[in-house]
């Protein structure tokens, strides 16, 4: 599905930008702890952005419906990486409670891909 290629490319692009911003713009503004949080958000955004690209590419070539997988990965990025970016910038710790929602969305998305693959 074209939408997942677009979302994947945009997320990979944003991960490069947020990674550079973290390394150069936040270096002396955040503690090592919160820089690490920022880096984790960037890393997971990149991994799952690449996952979205893969979902977009395989969606037209397989008999399994991968649309749910794509949406779960996308919203996983929003909740997981998004909450970590906000946490790093604001240092409001309660925001970290949102992060596991994104993690669960990632896990369920990948699991659905595995299950769908076995059904082929």
UniProtKB/Swiss-Prot annotation:
Keywords assigned by UniProt, alphabetized: Cell membrane, Membrane, Transmembrane, Transmembrane helix
Intracellular or extracellular location(s): Cell membrane
Domain of life: Bacteria
Ranges that cross the membrane: 3-23, 46-66, 69-89, 94-114
Any single Gene Ontology cellular-component annotation: plasma membrane
Principal subcellular localization: membrane
Entry membrane topology: Multi-pass membrane protein
Matches recorded under InterPro entries: DUF423
Family designation: Belongs to the UPF0382 family.
PANTHER family xrefs: TRANSMEMBRANE PROTEIN 256
Protein name as annotated: UPF0382 membrane protein SSP2132
Origin species: Staphylococcus saprophyticus subsp. saprophyticus (strain ATCC 15305 / DSM 20229 / NCIMB 8711 / NCTC 7292 / S-41)
């Amino acid at each position: 599905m074209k939408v997942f290629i677009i979302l994947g490319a945009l997320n990979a692009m944003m991960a490069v930008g947020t990674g550079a911003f973290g390394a150069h713009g936040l270096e002396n503004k955040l503690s090592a702890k919160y820089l690490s949080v920022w880096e984790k958000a960037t890393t997971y955004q990149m991994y799952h952005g690449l996952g979205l690209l893969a979902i977009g590419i395989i969606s037209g070539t397989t008999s399994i419906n991968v649309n749910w997988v794509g949406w779960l990965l996308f919203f996983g990025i929003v909740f997981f990486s998004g909450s970590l970016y906000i946490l790093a910038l604001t240092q409001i710790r309660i925001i970290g409670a949102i992060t596991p929602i994104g993690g669960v969305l990632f896990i369920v998305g990948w699991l659905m891909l595995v299950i769908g693959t076995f059904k082929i």
